[in-house]
Curated annotation (Swiss-Prot):
One Gene Ontology cellular component: nucleoid
Gene giving rise to this polypeptide: mukB
One MF annotation (Gene Ontology) recorded for this entry: ATP binding
Protein name: Chromosome partition protein MukB
Binding residues annotated for ATP, in chain numbering: G34, G35, N36, G37, A38, G39, K40, S41
Length: 1486
């Protein structure tokens, strides 16, 4: 593995604070630690100055004016130097283990501009033991030393053996040496390259993300591909010259194109019209014959259509008559179905209402009972309330009376009187005149017992009354049922009538049960009756179609006869079909054969024309395809011999051209590289020194120098040695001769001259013998003589080459003609004449058409008979299964009988349906009708008498009770006793009054509550009665409506009615369908007859017009044929292949040619007048005159000295051969020069892919780089969308834009720019020229967009910008970008330097304290992995674990400022090692 070059040390001489200081640089990281002003930036500035000694770039910002609006004159360098000579040197060792010291001598220039003078130099071959400070300083004594100026340094080094000192006048040479020796990574050819390198170093020095670099990453990372641009420029220049030549050839071809165009268009114009007239004459004859045939056929068709029209009209009238009857039957059936459906719906409603009425009846009876009970309770409540009211009133009156009695003191007397009155009333009621107050209690018990007895008797009578009332209601119910069923009758007749109704109900139920079987039987018989009627209709229709009446017994025999006739007709029809198919097949085969022959005929005619042309061109007659192929092989052999000779002549011509070009080089150099090497070495070509040698001396000097005649004469060979190292771009043998080019002679050789030869003694043991060359080339005179002879030879070769090219071109055209003939016409050229075969096939086709017409007429009659027989068999097939129905005469009577029985059963069913419920209710209670409960009135009277007796007993008992209660009143005899009892009675009356009022209140409340309940019961009752009456009324209405409908509503009635309606609808639909068919057919027949009539008239008119036209055109055609034959142009005008084109195509062809001819002869007055006269369509012979005039005009313009032929067509062919040869030669040259757009796209795309892969490899080295929150750094390389679209179009869709790249007015760069503008119209191109834009588009770098991204914390990947990162993160990210750029430069420059060189890698970092320990460790790891050296500057607190650390402290001692430096290498277990190279205190190290 090649070791990477390293910077060993940095030496500062006479810098501010550093007199002679050498810093040994660590292989990885060198840290400069110190406070502000310690000299860290000065040390780094010295390094940068030695690396890039360009004063236009150097600018150390941290020491210039902060905030200045203009740049400092010092730019930071002048103030870092001391007066006198200063040095900054870099000691390096490269991959070849060569020690190289490069550096600069700096010196302040006096003046206010504060300028600095810089001189770069390099030292090679310096021993390792010599330190850089020893070279540039001279020790005066122990305490003093002197800095050597540059000239003394040069003398000192020249005195040292093996040491080379080089001073450079240009920075380019200085950097070129550094690149070649592996000190810098990139060859810096220009100021732009140096600026990029300085920006890189500056960015690394000050840290962070440099916007100057990130904005132009493409320039830093992507190499320029200038070779592609140069190749395109050369290509465009050659193409421009070639196109100019081709344009000149096209101008020359214009005359040839005009002649060819005139002949071609004139031939098309006249031949198309000539053949159109010939075709029209033949077509008119064919049309006349066709019109005559069609006229005869149309007359026959019209007669057949007339017969057909009469038959269909008769059948249509029959169907129209039958349709009215079917419509009436169908309407009646539909109405009947609607009535049945209505009756069924009415019946369903009746049944539903009857069920509702029964339910309402039950609810009504229940509600009547509830209302009766409520009324009784209401009466009791009213009586109780009335009694309570009376008692309250009585007590109040008693209390009022008592109060009054108190006032008059007569109360006792009143009570006594009342007691006496009560006793008298009891006596009166009880009829006890002896009743006293004392015996009243005994009589009270007697009358209470009597009251109890009367009450018991009344209750017994009440029970009997209830039972009698029930019997009376049952009798009334049964009587009402009988009245509802039978009508009004006497009550004594109810029993007999009820029994009769029950017996009749049983019979009616029995009949009603027979409704369904009778209905099914009737439906079956009606179906059979309808089938019988249909069979009778079919039989009548069949007899009508056959034109004869047939008996039922004759139908089977007739059926067999018709089947036999169908079989025979089917065989004949089948045979006729096969015969017709055979005829049609033969006709189709003939037609297909004729069509194929007509399609082949133009091809065969074209093949014959091509074959005749070939025979004329080669003078051979070809009778078979073998003759053609044999002649083609001979032609190929001749062509191959001519091509070989032409290529030999061409190769010799090219060799002569190359030799002329080589000899025409200035100075006689045959290799351009020699001129570049001579300029590089500072020498002169030997051929230039002897350029003036005479032609006679040229052979001697050429033999004298031999192979070294192309040597380079240099003043000093030792100075050329360094240029020869790694020199690859040179001839295999490069001769160098030391000498003065101004006074060079041939004394460098020891030579003996012989006869036409010399012997050169190169060394004591090496001689060279060289003869004089026959054609000397040494010297300008010899070269010019050789060039003259070569030019003469080139003229001969060019003439011979042109002759051979013409012959080859002619042979190739003949070969192409044969190839085209073989590829297109050989397969048909030697076949039989298709037109003769077409004529034979046409005659056979006419015979087939005549036979087919006769066969069609015969077959039509058989087909009609066959169809009639098939219709008869079809009708019989429908009639024969119904013969038994036709023979059944009693079917209608049986239907009537069953219908009558069904009517009786349906009447019984209606009776049962109407009165079934009443009979069912009457049957369990019919027995109550046997006796009429007339004693019910007597029982009612007894009950009323019992009630009166009970009331009388109650009154008597009450009167006795009152006497008993007033028994005390009888003792009131005086008023004193009466007054003494006033107080007690008053209180008792008041208590009874309160109790009576409370009782009255309760009675009123009970009366009101029960009254509300009674009202609700009455409302429910009224609602039920209303609903019952409404439904009863609706039921009666529905029954009346059902009776009014007059239709039997049973379960099968609807189905029967629907079947009947559907049958009639099917018959009506069939009749209408047949009628519509007949109407359409009749309309079509009438239209066909009208069309045939019009067609007959038109055919008659067309036939007579065509006959007249044929006769009229015959005279004009004869005149045209005479003119064609007289002028001998029939061969060119009678193009038989045009006979197969239509008239429109020929007319279009002629019109197009006419338009082209008007333009072609616009400048020729004679041809223009003849052409205008030929446009008359009524005078076709004038077109022939125009064609003859064109041929005569072209014959007069053929140059017989160049083209010896009288035929203009042949002359054009010869001219075309020569011009085609020249065009092909130049076109092939242009194709060699041109490059396709797809190739351009591929080159650019491959370059982009290569660079993307390279960037991807660079990204891999930065995957694990992390600074702070930045976890990784990467570089994104994307193709711009607009440019990607351009590449896609160039590679995939370039055919759509060939108008740009095939344009002769645009170069490739301009076409590319135009395409870019076409694809991106939104982009403003400004004032830039398309050529400039196109050249930019040829640079692949303009297609790419590059940006740096960092993976930072939770933000993920984002664009690397200083504002989005911390200071340390920005420094680390910027360092990663710079490392990537350096690595990219190395990869880019690897092919430019030696393979055994691996350049040095070194970057800077000032103010590294902004990085944390982890970031510092990452930098160390990055340096170790990439073998990169890093110089960082940091304050006191930086203490790296690896590398070398220098502690800088600036001190002032005796008015002298110097920097105290202490260095230590890493952290080792032992004590820090003092580094060598310190020239101050013993503890200091450098």
């Amino acid at each position: 593995m090649i070791e990477r070059g390293k910077f060993r040390s940095l030496t500062l001489i006479n810098w501010n604070g550093f007199f002679a200081r050498t810093f040994d640089l660590d292989e990885l990281v060198t840290t400069l630690s110190g406070g502000n002003g310690a000299g860290k930036s000065t040390t780094m500035a010295a390094f940068v100055t030695a690396l890039i000694p360009d004063l236009t770039l150097l600018h150390f910002r941290n020491t210039t004016e902060a905030g200045a609006t203009s740049g400092s004159r010092d730019k930071g360098l002048h103030g870092k130097l001391k007066a006198g000579v200063c040095y900054s040197m870099l000691d390096t060792i490269n991959s070849r283990h060569q020690r190289v010291v490069v550096g600069v001598r700096l010196q302040q220039v006096a003046g206010r501009d504060r300028k600095v003078d810089i001189k770069p130099f390099a030292i090679q071959g310096l021993p390792m033991s010599v330190q850089p400070t020893q070279l540039v300083t001279e020790t005066l004594n122990e305490r003093q030393a002197r800095v050597l100026p540059l000239n003394e340094l040069k003398d000192k080094l020249e005195a040292m053996e093996g040491v080379q000192f080089k001073q450079f006048n240009s920075i380019t040479d200085y950097h070129s040496l550094m690149f070649d020796l592996g000190i810098i990574a990139r060859r810096l050819r220009s100021a732009s390259d140096r600026s990029k390198f300085y920006r890189l170093i500056e960015a690394s020095l000050y840290g962070g993300i440099s916007s100057a670099i990130t904005r132009s990453l493409r320039d830093y990372l992507l190499p320029e591909n200038s070779g592609v641009r140069k190749a395109f420029q050369d290509m465009e220049a050659a193409l421009r010259e070639n196109r100019m030549t081709l344009e000149a050839i096209r101008v020359t071809q214009s005359d040839r194109d005009l002649f060819k165009h005139l002949i071609s268009e004139a031939t098309n114009y006249v031949a198309a019209d000539y053949m159109r007239h010939a075709n029209e004459r033949r077509v008119h004859l064919d049309k006349a014959l066709e019109f005559r045939r069609e006229l005869h056929t149309s007359r026959q068709q019209l007669a057949a259509e007339q017969y057909k029209h009469v038959d269909m009209a008769r059948e249509l009238a029959e169907h129209n008559g039958a349709e009215g009857d079917l419509e009436a039957d169908y309407q009646a059936a539909s109405d009947h179905l609607n009535l049945v459906q209505t009756a069924l719906r009415q019946q369903e409603k009746i049944e539903r209402y009857e069920a509702d009425l029964d339910e309402l009846q039950i609810r009504l009876e229940e509600q009547n009972e509830v209302v009766a009970e409520a009324i009784e309770r209401q009466e009791e409540n009213e009586a109780r309330a009335e009694a309570a009211e009376l008692e309250v009133d009585e007590l109040k009156s008693q209390l009022a009376d008592y109060q009054q009695a108190l006032d008059v003191q007569q109360t006792r007397a009143i009570q006594y009187n009342q007691a006496i009155a009560a006793l008298n009333r009891a006596k009166e009621l009880c009829h006890l005149p002896d009743l006293t107050a004392d015996c009243a209690a005994e009589w009270l018990e007697t009358f209470q017992a009597k009251e109890l007895e009367a009450t018991e008797k009344m209750l017994s009578l009440e029970q009997k009354m209830s039972m009698a009332q029930t019997a009376h209601s049952q009798f009334e119910q049964a009587y009402q049922l009988v009245v509802a069923i039978n009508g009004p009758l006497a009550r004594n007749e109810a029993w007999d009538v009820a029994r009769e109704l029950l017996r009749e109900g049983v019979d009616q139920r029995h009949l009603a049960e027979q409704v369904q079987p009778l209905r099914m039987r009737l439906s079956e018989l009606e179906q059979r009756l309808r089938e019988q009627q249909e069979a009778e209709r079919l039989l009548a229709d069949f007899c009508k179609r056959q034109g004869k009446n047939f008996d039922i017994d004759e139908l089977e025999a007739l059926h067999q006869e018709l089947e036999a006739r169908i079989a025979s007709l089917s065989d004949s029809v089948s045979n006729a079909r096969e015969e017709r198919m055979a005829l049609r097949q033969e006709q189709e085969q003939l037609q297909s054969r004729i069509q194929s022959l007509m399609q082949r005929a133009p091809v065969w005619l074209a093949a014959q024309n091509s074959l005749n042309q070939l025979s004329e061109q080669c003078g051979e007659e070809f009778t078979s395809s073998q003759d053609v192929t044999e002649y083609l092989q001979q032609l190929l052999e001749r062509e191959r011999e001519a091509i070989v000779e032409r290529d030999e002549v061409g190769a010799r011509k090219n060799a002569v051209d190359e030799e002329i070009e080589r000899l025409s080089q200035p100075g006689g150099s045959e290799d351009q590289r020699l001129n570049a090497l001579a300029e590089r070495f500072g020498g002169v070509l030997l051929s230039e020194i002897y350029d003036d040698v005479s032609l006679e001396d040229a052979p001697y000097f050429s033999a004298l120098y031999g192979p070294s005649r192309h040597a380079i004469v240099v003043p000093d060979l030792s100075q050329v040695t360094e240029h020869l190292e790694g020199l690859t771009d040179c001839p295999e043998d490069l001769y160098l001769i030391e000498g003065d080019p101004q006074s060079f002679d041939d004394s460098v050789f020891s030579v003996d001259e012989l006869e036409k030869a010399v012997v050169v003694k190169i060394a004591d043991r090496q001689w060279r013998y060289s003869r004089f060359p026959e054609v000397p080339l040494f010297g300008r005179a010899a070269r010019e003589s050789r060039i003259e002879s070569l030019h003469a030879e080139r003229e001969v070769l060019s003439e011979r080459f042109a002759t051979l090219s013409f012959d080859v071109q002619k042979t190739q055209r003949l070969h192409q003609a044969f190839s085209r003939f073989i590829g297109s016409h050989l397969a048909v050229a030697f076949e039989s004449d298709p037109e003769a075969e077409i004529r034979q096939l046409n005659s056979r086709r006419v015979e087939l058409e005549r036979a087919l017409s006769n066969h069609e007429n015969d077959n039509q009659q058989q087909r009609i008979q066959f169809e009639q027989a098939k219709e008869g068999v079809t009708a019989l097939n429908r009639i024969l299964p119904r013969l038994n129905l036709l023979a059944d005469d009693s079917l209608a009577d049986r239907v009537d009988e069953i219908r009558e029985r069904l009517d009786e059963a349906q009447e019984a069913a209606r009776f049962v349906q109407q009165f079934g419920n009443q009979l069912a209710k009457l049957e369990p209670i019919v027995s109550v009708l046997q006796s009429d409960p007339e004693q019910f009135e007597q029982l009612k009277e007894d009950y009323a008498y019992s009630q009166q007796m009970q009331r009388d007993a109650r009154q008597q008992a009450f009167a006795l009770t009152e006497v008993v209660q007033r028994r005390a009143h009888f003792s009131y005899s005086d008023s004193a006793e009466m007054l003494s009892g006033n107080s007690d009675l008053n209180e008792k009356l008041r208590e009874r009054l309160e109790q009576a009022e409370a009782e009255r209140t309760r009675a009123r409340e009970a009366l009101r509550g029960h009254a509300a309940q009674l009202s609700q019961y009455n409302q429910v009752l009224a609602s039920l009665k209303s609903s019952y009456d409404t439904k009863k009324e609706l039921l009666n209405d529905l029954q009346r409506e059902l009776q009014d409908i007059g239709v039997r509503a049973d379960s099968g009635a609807e189905e029967r009615a629907r079947i009947r309606r559907d049958e009639l609808h099917a018959q009506l639909s069939n009749n209408r369908s047949r009628r519509n068919q007949l109407e359409k057919a009749l309309t079509f027949c009438e239209a066909e007859m009208d069309n045939l009539t019009r067609k007959l008239r038109k055919l008659e008119r067309d036939y007579f017009e065509m006959r007249e036209q044929v006769v009229t055109a015959k005279a004009g055609w004869c005149a045209v044929m005479r003119m064609v034959k007289d002028n001998g142009v029939e061969r060119r005008l009678h193009r038989r292949e045009l006979a197969y084109l239509s008239a429109d195509d020929l007319r279009s062809m002629s019109d197009k040619a006419l338009g082209a001819l008007r333009l072609a002869v616009a400048d020729n007055e004679h041809l223009r007048d003849v052409l205008r006269m030929s446009e008359d369509p009524k005078r076709p012979e004038r077109k022939i005159q125009f064609f003859v005039a064109v041929y005569q005009h072209l014959r007069e313009r053929i140059r017989q000295d160049i083209i010896r032929t009288d035929d203009p067509v042949e002359a054009i062919e010869q001219m075309e051969i020569e011009l085609s040869r020249l065009t092909e030669e130049l076109t092939s040259r242009e194709q060699k020069l041109a490059i396709s757009s797809r190739s351009v796209a591929n080159i650019i795309r491959k370059t982009i892919q290569r660079e993307q892969n390279r960037i991807r490899m660079l990204n891999q080295g930065l995957q694990n780089v992390s600074f702070g929150q930045v976890n990784s750094v990467r570089l994104n390389v994307n193709v711009r969308e607009t440019h990607a679209m351009l590449l896609d179009v160039l590679s995939e869709q370039h055919e759509q834009h060939q108008d740009l790249f095939n344009s002769n007015r645009l170069t490739f760069s301009e076409a590319l720019a135009k395409l870019y503008q076409r694809l991106n119209p939104q982009i403003d191109m400004g004032q830039r020229a398309p050529q400039t834009i196109g050249e930019e588009l040829l640079d692949y770098r303009n297609y790419l967009e590059m940006e740096v991204e960092v993976n930072r914390g939770s933000d993920g990947w984002l664009r690397a910008e200083s504002g989005a990162l911390s200071t340390g993160e920005a420094i680390g990210t910027g360092m990663s970008i710079l490392v990537m750029v350096v690595q990219s430069w190395e990869d880019e420059s690897r092919r430019l330097r030696g393979k055994d060189i691996s350049p040095c890698r070194l970057l800077f970092l000032d103010e590294a304290a902004r990085l944390d320990a982890r970031s510092i460790a990452t930098l160390f790891e990055l340096c170790e992995r990439l073998q990169m050296q890093l110089i960082i500057a940091a304050p006191e607190n930086i203490s790296p674990e690896k590398g070398t650390t220098y502690k800088l402290v600036r001190k002032v001692f005796q008015n002298t400022e110097h920097v105290h430096v202490v260095g230590l290498r890493g952290f080792a277990p032992q004590l820090p090692e003092t580094l060598p190279g310190s020239d101050e205190a013993p503890s200091q190290a450098s």
